């Protein structure tokens, strides 16, 4: 999903989240690719992105995935998501995710967010924002059927 680019172009309705290139070595970038590939369907739907390509410049990694919003909490949720995604890619020993259909999108993505570290009251609003575009029940894998 990476796409080298010399001159970054800003789109007025896009929010681009950037991280320093020096934070991600080649192994971390490979892990990032696998994580994104493994959750691409859910990530795209959750954030409303058409593409999950990221751009690498000499000193930055840019994620132009998000739609600009006036809501500071929503922007913060997107920034935190990229930060946690990069952190997972840096610290993971191995990544073996396959993008597969899920019956309950909201539950599957909530579990993914928890694995990324969106745990506790401080991330409650971010989880809510990142889950709002998905279908299903976030609390129960089978939608509450037991």
Located regions from the model:
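Long, charge-dense low-complexity segments
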Residues: 1-146
């Amino acid at each position: 999903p990476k796409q080298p680019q010399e001159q970054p172009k800003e789109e007025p309705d896009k929010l681009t989240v950037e991280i320093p290139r020096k934070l991600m070595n080649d192994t971390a970038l490979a892990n990032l690719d696998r994580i994104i590939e493994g959750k691409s369907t859910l990530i795209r739907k959750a954030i409303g992105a058409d593409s999950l390509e990221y751009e690498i410049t000499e000193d930055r990694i840019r994620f132009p995935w998000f739609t600009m919003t006036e809501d500071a909490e929503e922007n913060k949720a997107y920034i935190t998501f990229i930060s946690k995604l990069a952190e997972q890619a840096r610290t993971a020993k191995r990544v073996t995710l396959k993008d597969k259909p899920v019956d309950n999108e909201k539950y599957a993505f909530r579990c993914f967010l928890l694995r990324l570290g969106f745990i506790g009251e401080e991330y409650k609003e971010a989880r809510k924002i990142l889950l709002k575009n998905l279908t299903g029940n976030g609390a129960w894998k089978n939608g509450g059927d037991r």
